[in-house]
Regions:
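Conserved catalytic network of the ASCE P-loop NTPase/AAA+ motor domain
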Residues: 33-36, 54-58, 100-102
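Short, well-ordered alpha-helical microsegments
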Residues: 49-51, 117-118
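NTP-dependent small-molecule kinase module
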Residues: 82, 100-149
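Ras-like small GTPase catalytic G-domain
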Residues: 60, 70-72, 78-100, 115-116
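Conserved phosphate-donor/acceptor-positioning beta-strand/loop module used by diverse small-molecule
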Residues: 41-46, 55-79, 111
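ATP-dependent small-molecule kinase phosphotransfer cores
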Residues: 1-41, 48
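Residue-level signature of catalytic and energy-coupling elements of molecular machines
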Residues: 4, 42, 95, 109
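Conserved AAA+ ATPase "sensor/coupling" helix adjacent to the nucleotide-binding pocket
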Residues: 10-14, 76-83, 124-127
């Protein structure tokens, strides 16, 4: 906890949150290294934190992944058998709060089938890479080449 608080004070985390008495966060250096290497970085974070990340990094793509219904969410939480009913009720309450901000995300993905959900996330991310405003360098290069034809 003390080391984490030092990292917060030094602005070494892109995002962080305290959840169920534990700190969670993403080191800035790690994310910057991955992005510079041309890799995508996927963060599983709460809405308030996601919106802060989007403020700091406007190119951030926000995907809201949700089960098909509240009943299914409860069923999955209970089915795990790893949490008490108090924790399940708390998580359901948090889900209700998070759902209030669904429209602030760029995409909504309904996780009815895990593999389909993963494939859809992949398609969305790949599609974002292909958007023209993200490919300015290629576009300019192509225009220059075509001028010489």
């Amino acid at each position: 906890t003390e080391e984490f608080e030092k990292m917060i004070a030094k602005d070494e985390l892109i995002e962080y949150a305290r959840y169920v008495d534990n700190y969670y966060g993403t080191p800035r250096v790690y994310v910057e290294e991955q992005l510079e290497a041309g890799k995508d970085v996927v963060l599983e974070i709460e809405i308030q934190v996601a919106l802060k990340v989007k403020e700091k990094f406007p190119d951030t793509l926000l995907l809201f992944v949700t089960p098909p219904s509240a009943q299914e969410l409860r069923s999955r939480l209970v089915g795990r058998g790893t949490e008490t009913m108090d924790v399940i009720e708390y998580r359901m309450s948090r889900a209700k709060e998070e759902a209030e901000g669904m429209e602030k995300y760029d995409y909504l993905i309904i996780n009815d089938d895990l593999m389909e959900c993963v494939e859809e996330m992949h398609r969305i991310i790949q599609g974002e890479h292909r958007r023209s405003f993200r490919n300015h360098e290629f576009i300019e290069h192509m225009k220059e080449e075509l001028k010489g034809e």
